Amino acid sequence: MVTLGMDENSHLGGIAFDGDNVWVCNSYENCVERISYDFIELMAYQNTGDVVDARDVVDEFPVKNTPSCITWYGGRLWIATHTLLVNSRMVAYYLDKKTDKLIALSDYKIPQKVQGVTFDDSGNVYLSTSYGRNQSSYLYCYDSVTALATRPKHPRKKVEMPPASEELDVRDNTLYIPVSYTHLTLPTNS
């Protein structure tokens, strides 16, 4: 285990893996940062238990929407923007390997307060919405990107979740959602 130090000014809100690289949202710089997975493995091996300053080894890619959460699906980076009062947006990007630049392909309206996005192998889209530790979070399930694009306020299923349910991922037909709790009370000795 190693900790990588990133941009200290940013809210690093999302992370994705494309098979070769780890991508991290940097909302402060309005970009996503790419870190080679080989570098991460090397640092974990050589610097176990340490904090490694990785600011100089990341590649920054500017994006047209403020990155709040991110996923990799179908050869694309899907980057969503969190807003409070109006519909947010999600943009699908393609990495042009010749120019090493992200190319925006499609732009979608999505519900407000989106903090996580993922897809399953069938193309179903899952969005996690959350704001604060005292309000319920919601999981929105759509049959496809087309269903999301045409009816963002009408998911196939909407599930109430505990507060602060944010990032999510699908692996082996199982949806994983880490949940943060507002408080943990432990007994103390006086």
Region annotations inferred by a language model:
Residues 149-169:
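Conserved blade-ending motifs and adjacent loop-strand segments that build the rim/top face
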Residues 24-28, 79-84, 127-133, 177-181:
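Conserved beta-strand positions in repeat-built beta-propeller and related beta-rich domains
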Residues 37-47, 93-100, 144-149:
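Short loop/turn segments immediately following beta-strands, especially the blade-tip
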Residues 9-14, 63-70, 111-118, 162-169:
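Repeated scaffold domains used in trafficking and secretory/extracellular systems
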